[in-house]
Amino acid sequence: MKVAVGVHIIADLYGVDARLISSSEAISPIMENAIQEGHLTKISSEYYQFRPMGASGIALLAESHLSFHTWPEYGLVTLDIYTCGDRSNADRAFDYIIKVLKPTSVDYRKMERGSQIKEDVRITDPQMML
């Protein structure tokens, strides 16, 4: 039997209001709230403000990460949500971001990560990894 270790949502959000994505000050609370809405566990986050506009950010999660990059001049947000926890948590975080940013269109991909791992090769004794 094969197992997957996580789910990775990769999305391009088009037609987003530039006022929502021009500054890290505007978009960082949206991403922080998405983490909460997704029941994800934030370890740390970092946001960067580009000049004259645009922002990037990444949140390190206990489950993996959430990252984004914005191009306000195009109304574009590129987004990654990767979690090795409950798969529905990534969906909840994504749905929240869509609800708040209201893109006019979305290019969305969802991948099962590590899906070629065979269950019978799992190391269950931590001493075997030392």
Swiss-Prot record:
<feature type="modified residue" description="Pyruvic acid (Ser); by autocatalysis">
    <location>
        <position position="64"/>
    </location>
</feature>
<feature type="active site" description="Proton donor; for catalytic activity">
    <location>
        <position position="84"/>
    </location>
</feature>
<dbReference type="InterPro" id="IPR016067">
    <property type="entry name" value="S-AdoMet_deCO2ase_core"/>
</dbReference>
<feature type="active site" description="Schiff-base intermediate with substrate; via pyruvic acid">
    <location>
        <position position="64"/>
    </location>
</feature>
<feature type="active site" description="Proton acceptor; for processing activity">
    <location>
        <position position="69"/>
    </location>
</feature>
<keyword id="KW-0865">Zymogen</keyword>
<comment type="pathway">
    <text>Amine and polyamine biosynthesis; S-adenosylmethioninamine biosynthesis; S-adenosylmethioninamine from S-adenosyl-L-methionine: step 1/1.</text>
</comment>
<dbReference type="GO" id="GO:0004014">
    <property type="term" value="F:adenosylmethionine decarboxylase activity"/>
</dbReference>
<comment type="subunit">
    <text>Heterotetramer of two alpha and two beta chains arranged as a dimer of alpha/beta heterodimers.</text>
</comment>
<keyword id="KW-0210">Decarboxylase</keyword>
<comment type="similarity">
    <text>Belongs to the prokaryotic AdoMetDC family. Type 1 subfamily.</text>
</comment>
<dbReference type="GO" id="GO:0005829">
    <property type="term" value="C:cytosol"/>
</dbReference>
<dbReference type="InterPro" id="IPR003826">
    <property type="entry name" value="AdoMetDC_fam_prok"/>
</dbReference>
<dbReference type="Pfam" id="PF02675">
    <property type="entry name" value="AdoMet_dc"/>
</dbReference>
<feature type="site" description="Cleavage (non-hydrolytic); by autolysis">
    <location>
        <begin position="63"/>
        <end position="64"/>
    </location>
</feature>
<keyword id="KW-0456">Lyase</keyword>
<protein>
    <recommendedName>
        <fullName>S-adenosylmethionine decarboxylase proenzyme</fullName>
        <ecNumber>4.1.1.50</ecNumber>
    </recommendedName>
</protein>
<comment type="function">
    <text>Catalyzes the decarboxylation of S-adenosylmethionine to S-adenosylmethioninamine (dcAdoMet), the propylamine donor required for the synthesis of the polyamines spermine and spermidine from the diamine putrescine.</text>
</comment>
<keyword id="KW-0068">Autocatalytic cleavage</keyword>
<keyword id="KW-0949">S-adenosyl-L-methionine</keyword>
<keyword id="KW-0704">Schiff base</keyword>
<keyword id="KW-0745">Spermidine biosynthesis</keyword>
<keyword id="KW-0620">Polyamine biosynthesis</keyword>
<dbReference type="GO" id="GO:0008295">
    <property type="term" value="P:spermidine biosynthetic process"/>
</dbReference>
<dbReference type="InterPro" id="IPR017716">
    <property type="entry name" value="S-AdoMet_deCOase_pro-enz"/>
</dbReference>
<keyword id="KW-0670">Pyruvate</keyword>
